[in-house]
Amino acid sequence: MVQSLHEFLEENINYLKENGLYNEIDTIEGANGPEIKINGKSYINLSSNNYLGLATNEDLKSAAKAAIDTHGVGAGAVRTINGTLDLHDELEETLAKFKGTEAAIAYQSGFNCNMAAISAVMNKNDAILSDELNHASIIDGCRLSKAKIIRVNHSDMDDLRAKAKEAVESGQYNKVMYITDGVFSMDGDVAKLPEIVEIAEEFGLLTYVDDAHGSGVMGKGAGTVKHFGLQDKIDFQIGTLSKAIGVVGGYVAGTKELIDWLKAQSRPFLFSTSLAPGDTKAITEAVKKLMDSTELHDKLWDNAQYLKNGLSKLGYDTGESETPITPVIIGDEKTTQEFSKRLKDEGVYVKSIVFPTVPRGTGRVRNMPTAAHTKDMLDEAIAAYEKVGKEMKLI
């Protein structure tokens, strides 16, 4: 007798709940800003990816409303039929200038970018070297390509060199690509791009950087690749338009030749309706803001350093983060989840992150300070960390 859908779901949902792996989803009442409201109660929000506070920016809201008035609420078709609006062309030209590349292509999400770009270029005759802590969308994009996937120890340049040498010298593959996050989302560490480029040039590797958490944050806002001055050395620059940019979507930036190929061959571009007009115009406005001023970028880093210093002085382990991402590493999964709940009771919303998202025994709460937080908010959060940490005997 085959298993019914109900039996499958009941068994596996119960397993998740019994093992502390079931994710309870909270509904936010209103905007996702530095303060949020859930079930009528206000919280200091340290869980969003809204790094620069642009998700609630008045100029972006005005731009979106104006675009809806002139272009409607939807694009009406896929890009290759008649869903490419002048707004999309303007956005992609702006993104290319922002990233220092010849061209760019916009997608409906950052996840779509990795599903699209990897499988459009790599196939069963190729090999992909992938950092072991890369985002789930990279993992899925690699699987979709059917290329040989070779896991590389996290930011281990000796391991990368050895595996690149082995893959290239084996003669089994037409192309070999190395893929890495620019900024790793769980720990906040930065990819060693100068060393990666050196190894890539030595062995002829294609280079692919997913800068979801670096765009708007690193390189005075232009990203991790710009931070290291390597715009002409990285073949694929990937980014989201939903984190620091504050809206929705993703993009690939690179040579005109690459972008032409993606427009012809990447399936999410070919078979999914393009970004909505309001979103598209708001994104363009956000990118132009970052090109015109570093004010929000600088405020983000100032707030991040303030929070890190406060948590470190209390005795918390904030890991090796080199970016505003600020983990507080607790260790035990159940203790981590209890810690997050107790902080919520004190008015601080910061989610627990445990196995399998991070290795077992490295549970943490991940703080995401933004440019929109005030020092008073951060002081209140630090005070809550002190109170709960002492009550739970963690500090």
Curated annotation (Swiss-Prot):
Chain positions found as N6-(pyridoxal phosphate)lysine: 243
Disulphide-bridged cysteine pairs: none
Keyword Transferase: yes
Stored Gene3D superfamilies: Aspartate Aminotransferase, domain 1, Type I PLP-dependent aspartate aminotransferase-like (Major domain)
Cofactor: pyridoxal 5'-phosphate
InterPro entries in the cross-refs: Aminotrans_II_pyridoxalP_BS, Aminotransferase_I/II_large, AON_synthase_class-II, AONS_Archaea/Firmicutes, PyrdxlP-dep_Trfase, PyrdxlP-dep_Trfase_major, PyrdxlP-dep_Trfase_small
Keyword Transferase: yes
Protein name listed in UniProt: Putative pyridoxal phosphate-dependent acyltransferase
Species in which this protein is naturally found: Staphylococcus aureus (strain N315)
